[in-house]
C-alpha cells in the first residue's frame, strides 16, 4: 500500500515547490574573422590577371578610337561598316561561333604547352610577373608586401575618386543642374529609341560605329593636322617668301644704336656697397649648364675685350658723361671681365671639392682668381683693400675668396 501510494504520489508535486528551470548557458561570442590586408592585395592581383585579356582588348579599342595610327583606324572603321551592311543572319551566326571557338582553342593550347615550374624556379623568377597559382606559392618579404599594399591602396583611391566623379556627373544630369547637358542626354536617348524602331539593325550598328570613330575630338585633330600638311605642300613658296622677308630698315640708321644702348635708371642705388652686393649675389643666381656657360665664354673671348687703358682714356675724354654714368660704365666693364674669365671646371663642378652644382649647391666665383666654387669652399671674406683697392670704403667692404686666395692675401 505504502509503495503504491508513493508510486502514485511520485509525479504529483506541491504547488509551492516548482521545479527549477535549467539555466541556459550564455552563448559564447563568435570570433570575428581576422582581416588580412595582404590577402586582399593578393586577391586583387589575381583579379587583375584574370581580367588582363579584357584590359588588353579595351586598350586596343581605345588605341583605334584615338586615331593613334590614322590609316589603321580608317581601315577598321570602313571594314566594320562593310561587314555590318553586307553580312546576313547566317554569316552573323558563323562569326559568333568563330569568336567562341578561337579563344577556347587558344586557351587549350596554352594549357597543354605550358611548362610546370618547380618551387626553386618560381622563387628565382619572383621579380617577374607571377601567374595565378604562383601568387599563392611564392613568399614575399616584408618590404615587398608593404610596397604591394601601398600600390593597392593608391590604385583603390584613384578608382574610388573616378567612380565618385562619374556618379556626381550622372546626378547632375538627372537633377537638371545643367539644362543644356540634360536636354542633350535625354534627346539622345529618345533619338536612339526612334532609330532602333525605324531603322534595321545593320544600319543602327553602322551609324553607331561611324559615330564612335568619326565623332570624337581625336578625329578632328588628325584631320586638321593633315590639312595643315597639305597646305604646306601646296604652298611652299609663299612660306619661303614669308620667312625670307627682311625686317623694316631703321630710320636714319639709329635704331640699332638705340637698341644696343642700355636704358639708364637714375633711381637705382649706385653706391659702392650696393654694387658689391650685386656682384656677390650675381654668381649665386646663375644656374646654367656648364657646357652652355663654356660656349658663351668662348664666344665672348673670341669677340675680344677692349684695352683697359683705352677705356680709361675714353671715359676721361668724354665730357658728356655724368658721375653716375661713369660709375655705371666702370661696373659694367668689371662685370664683363668677371664673366669672360674662362672657368677651369667645364662640367659644372666645384674646383675645391668637385661637388656638382645644383639648386641646393650654388655656384660662387672667387673674387680674386675667378674660379667657380661652392658656397662652402668659397666662404672666406677678405677686405677689398687686400686686393689692391685704394678707396676709403675698401677698408670695410669684404668679398668672398677661396681658401688658397685667402692664404695668399692674408700674408
Swiss-Prot record:
Zinc finger FYVE-type: from-to: 344-410
Highest taxon in the source lineage: Eukaryota
Renumbered residue ranges of the record's region Sufficient for homooligomerization: 1-92
Chain ranges passing through the membrane: 67-87, 89-109
Spans within the Cytoplasmic topological domain: 1-66, 110-187, 209-411
Entry-linked Pfam families: FYVE
Entry comment on modification after translation: Phosphorylated. Phosphorylation is induced by NGF through the MAPK/ERK pathway and modulates interaction with RAB11A.
Annotated region described as Disordered, given as residue ranges: 1-27, 234-286
Intramembrane segments: 188-208
Protein name: Protrudin
Amino acid at each position: 500500500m505504502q509503495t503504491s501510494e508513493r508510486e502514485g504520489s511520485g509525479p504529483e508535486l506541491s504547488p509551492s515547490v516548482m521545479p527549477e528551470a535549467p539555466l541556459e548557458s550564455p552563448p559564447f561570442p563568435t570570433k570575428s574573422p581576422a582581416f588580412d590586408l595582404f590577402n586582399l592585395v593578393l586577391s586583387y592581383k589575381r583579379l587583375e590577371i584574370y581580367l588582363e585579356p579584357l584590359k588588353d582588348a579595351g586598350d586596343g579599342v581605345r588605341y583605334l578610337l584615338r586615331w593613334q595610327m590614322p590609316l589603321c583606324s580608317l581601315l577598321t572603321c570602313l571594314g566594320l561598316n562593310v561587314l555590318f551592311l553586307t553580312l546576313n543572319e547566317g554569316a552573323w551566326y558563323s562569326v559568333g561561333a568563330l569568336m567562341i571557338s578561337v579563344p577556347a582553342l587558344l586557351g587549350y593550347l596554352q594549357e597543354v604547352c605550358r611548362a610546370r615550374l618547380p618551387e626553386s624556379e618560381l622563387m628565382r623568377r619572383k621579380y617577374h610577373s607571377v601567374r595565378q597559382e604562383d601568387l599563392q606559392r611564392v613568399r614575399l618579404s616584408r618590404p615587398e608586401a608593404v610596397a604591394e599594399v601601398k600600390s593597392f591602396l593608391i590604385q583603390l583611391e584613384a578608382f574610388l575618386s573616378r567612380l565618385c566623379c562619374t556618379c556626381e556627373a550622372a546626378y547632375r544630369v538627372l537633377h537638371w543642374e545643367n539644362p543644356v547637358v540634360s536636354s542633350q542626354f535625354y534627346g539622345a536617348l529618345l533619338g536612339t529609341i526612334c532609330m532602333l524602331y525605324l531603322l534595321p539593325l545593320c544600319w543602327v550598328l553602322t551609324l553607331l560605329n561611324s559615330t564612335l570613330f568619326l565623332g570624337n575630338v581625336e578625329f578632328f585633330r588628325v584631320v586638321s593636322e593633315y590639312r595643315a600638311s597639305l597646305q604646306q605642300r601646296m604652298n611652299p613658296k609663299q612660306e619661303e617668301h614669308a620667312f625670307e622677308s627682311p625686317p623694316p630698315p631703321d630710320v636714319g640708321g639709329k635704331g640699332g644704336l638705340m637698341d644696343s644702348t642700355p636704358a639708364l635708371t637714375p633711381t637705382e642705388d649706385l653706391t659702392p656697397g650696393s654694387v658689391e652686393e650685386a656682384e656677390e649675389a650675381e654668381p649665386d643666381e646663375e644656374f646654367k649648364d656648364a657646357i652652355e656657360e663654356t660656349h658663351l665664354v668662348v664666344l665672348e673671348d673670341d669677340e675680344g675685350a677692349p684695352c683697359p687703358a683705352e677705356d680709361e682714356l675714353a671715359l676721361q675724354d668724354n665730357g658728356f658723361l655724368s658721375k653716375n654714368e661713369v660709375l655705371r660704365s666702370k661696373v659694367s666693364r668689371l662685370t664683363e671681365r668677371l664673366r669672360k674669365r674662362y672657368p677651369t671646371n667645364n662640367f659644372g663642378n666645384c674646383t675645391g671639392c668637385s661637388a656638382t652644382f645644383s639648386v641646393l649647391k650654388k655656384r660662387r666665383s672667387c673674387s680674386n682668381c675667378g674660379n667657380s666654387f661652392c658656397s662652402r669652399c668659397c666662404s672666406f671674406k677678405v677686405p677689398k683693400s687686400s686686393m689692391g683697392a685704394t678707396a676709403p670704403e675698401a677698408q670695410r667692404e669684404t668679398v668672398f675668396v677661396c681658401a688658397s686666395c685667402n692664404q695668399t692675401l692674408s700674408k
